Amino acid sequence: GCQVVSVKNQSLNVTITNERESILTRDKLSEASLNVLSMTGREAKICSEQPEECVSELKQIPQIQDEQLLSTASELYLAKALSLEKSSACKVSILAKTQSEEKQALQKQNYQSCLDQQLGMLDKSIRYSYAYMFNTKRGPQDRIFDNRQVQLRDFYNQAIAKLVNSYRLRHGPSEVGNQIKVGQSIYRINYDNYPLLKNRQVEQLMSTYNMNFSGLRSITRRDGFGSEFLIVLPPEHNDTSPEKAKYIVDPLHYQYTNGRNPNIHNARYLAATITAQPRSASSTDEILNNPEFEISAYDPYKFESAKIAGKSYPLAANFSAPYGLWLAQNNLGKAAYLSLIDRDARLTMPHLYMLEPYNPNKKVVVLVHGLASSPEAWIRLTNDVMGDPVLREHYQVWQVFYSTNMPILESRFQIYAIIQQSFN
């Protein structure tokens, strides 16, 4: 039969949207993936539901270039993972506890099976996107202006973020171990590029992509390679010390339990950048099938780039997320007003909070709030310091929180004491 072709102008925003959108921004595959499936006679809906069979068929077609195959496969596996995430099987019903034990056990089994399937899809998406970026005829530097490479970087970053989160849902909110096992794949977690975390327990790894903080004027990010994360450390052992709520007349000469003032708080929420790469792979087949992968955590304050596949690439980072989460979980504004009328026992003595791990090579800026106030008064300034690359490189912020219903001279002495103890 004959096919009639006509031409018409379309809006610029439609053109750009078609070029740049993907399964991450709409319930449809990207135009690049749809084109590959169309020219091979595959249905997008069927391939999204059965990615393994579809990818296996695509591999048998020699006309499909390596970049086309790897990028389409990565998006298909990610599409299936996102579909599973939205399904009822991968969610815990709020009515589950009211059902019989037999039904609860069956639902739990289905829930875990769904998460296992989702983890398998994310594992495949990570591998195919990595192979596209670092093991094709063209390297990343040859595709620097390609929209497709930006899409694949996003697939890679999101797949890592969702893999870590889904693994925590599947195996419970226990402390993060040294590996993540997905079927036959083993992702070993490496903290060599985050010296502070060596030999330290990590309570939680949290992706920051979906975090939004209404009280922050802006979110400070650094564009680059890798998935933006936030690391949560366990509470300090001295958090339950009876000296936290005890008024101490002369803190400079007081003998604290364990020799440390319990009101000095090291940073618990740390910015991190996560990458995933094969431990050893020289071919695309090894990248896709070798079970050994490595998740590397980077300290974005100390590392601006990472060596991936033998070359150095700038690292992404989110510097505002740890500060935003700290503010949200401490509810300091409410405590400030209660302290004014002497109703908050936590503020018998001043507290000092380090917003990042102490770095002796950076100058310390100590911010002290005023009457009936809290460290929330310094949100804009603190976020600006973290957002400016030069200030971030040379300064670190400490926040002091104290009860404002005490005499000014007494408050001044107590604050001076806790600052001195922090440096010691």
What role is predicted for each listed range?
Residues 1-2, 385:
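Sec-dependent N-terminal signal peptides of Gram-negative exported proteins
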Residues 3-365, 374-380, 396-399:
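Flexible, membrane-associating and regulatory peripheral segments of lipid-active enzymes
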Residues 362-424:
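Active-site catalytic motif of lipid deacylating hydrolases and related acyltransferases
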